[in-house]
Amino acid sequence: MSVIVICGATATGKSDLALSLAEAIGAEIVNADSMQLYKGMDIGTAKLALSQRRGIPHHLLDVLRVNQEASVAQYQIDARNIIDQLLELNKPVIVVGGTGLYIKAILDDLNFPDTDPALREKIAKQGQELGQDVMHQRLAKLDPAAAAAIPKENLRRVVRALEVIELTG
């Protein structure tokens, strides 16, 4: 049994295709959209209402409150566990979403460093005090490739990159 992946931008018909395919082959659907993990984040995410899911089981929808932070590392663990359980039951699996990193986390052998909330808070505080330009310059000095991939305006990702550098050396 294999895993089928349907990915693409929001509101491009992924869900309709997944539902039709799931009905045809008896599959269950695993969400791979980072915003659809959140309860109440329905507008703007094109999340299907329960009544639109045609009785097909959907996994990893509405699993976080809006005040909780999504973690791709935790998503990877949860999604792989669900997929493994379904495959053990000989259930076809359809992964549907538009968050490329989440899909890669399922399919590829990505390793995610641990987090250190105290360290992240310290670096985030520095970011608030020093500003995004200084923090991005610090990242560029320590990891030019990461700095090239992360816009300076995305302070949350800059802070996470600096945290990973400090944790992993």
Segments (PLM) and residue ranges:
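Phosphate/pyrophosphate-binding catalytic cores of soluble transferases and nucleic-acid-acting enzymes
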Residues: 1-169
